Amino acid sequence: MLRSLIFVFCTAMGIFLAVVQENYKRTLRFSFSAFVFFLVPLVFFALSRFFWADAAGLADYHNYFDFFNHADKVIENRFEVMAKVIRFFSPTFFLFLLSYSLISITLKVYTIDKISIYPLLSLVTYISTSFALHDIVQIRISCAIAIFLFSIRFLVEQKYLIYVLFISIAVCFHKSSAAFFIFLFFRKNSFHPAFWILSLIVIHVSAFLNINFIKLFLLVLGEDNYYYLSIISDMNQNLDLFNVNQLINIFIFLLLAFNSRKFISYKFFPIFMKIFFCSIAVYPLLNSVPIVASRFSEMLRPSIIFLLPLVINIFRRKWVGYIFFICICLMLSFLNNFYYSLVSI
């Protein structure tokens, strides 16, 4: 039932915010009251797991509940610290969920307001794509992603020490966040579409030819490393490199890449495009380790929150761009909430 509400909420908000965005200046930013107006319902939906989890059978909810009540027995020390800090103020599990939701959603909405060209449309994209999966189910990785998105402006402004500090904090929420350090080595102020499009083609062709990038890399380190990794890989099904979600993401990336000159003035465009590229490329690159590929793809995909709204500038008639944008958002929302059933509530 809740996923139906999210879908209806996304549809209504998408149409409403698109109209509002078009009728105000592009420099439109959230006032404090507007910030709270958007924040409260999102936090409410995120906290709904507290009331619906038993009926929905949310495994993640029950795992977090057990971890919270037995923090000293949790394998991950970072989670133990977070749980004990929250338990110091209150032993209630609801406060634990509220803390994670406030950290994650507040940072995301704040970042959208500060660095998105179309903050309202970015908000719609956020609700359509990563909100249900991350803020309702994967709450630790959601906080890590929120901190990563918040730190992007420091990366672009070449304040690397601050960026490293925030990513280190993100690692405290989820160790997979260490992958975000790699973007320190990316050029932040330029994007060459031909290079990245060609790279995307080469990577997928190589995967189609069954070239195992993980094996090639681990052979340098020693065969034993690949042996253990192959055991993990054998326990999982191979990824569908051209599933519907992946195809939509490739289409959006190519659409933006071919029209990249129109977004040259948006200083965050180059780095977000490269992050989005990585979210797509990680599937064929890490296809032999499906769990790892899916995890990293999910972590990097929220970059679409800031990129998808830009498509309205591609069309000569703005209203066509808005219709196209809303259709893509509804399609992604339907795929995430119903087709793939990422949140079975």
What is each PLM-predicted segment?
Residues 136-142:
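Short acidic/glycine- and proline-prone juxtamembrane loop motifs at membrane-interface regions
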Residues 1-2, 18-101, 335-345:
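TM-lumen/periplasm interface segments of multi-pass membrane proteins
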Residues 148-162:
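Membrane-interface transmembrane helices that cradle and orient dolichyl/undecaprenyl
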Residues 109-128:
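Transmembrane-helix signature of polytopic, membrane-embedded enzymes
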Residues 162-186:
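Membrane-interface alpha helices of multi-pass inner-membrane proteins
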Residues 197-201, 316-335:
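Signature aromatic-anchored transmembrane alpha helix within multi-pass, membrane-resident enzymes
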Residues 294-310:
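Hydrophobic/aromatic-rich transmembrane helices and adjacent perimembrane loops
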Residues 33, 55-66, 71-80, 184-296, ...:
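Alpha-helical transmembrane segments and terminal signal-anchor/GPI-anchor hydrophobic tails
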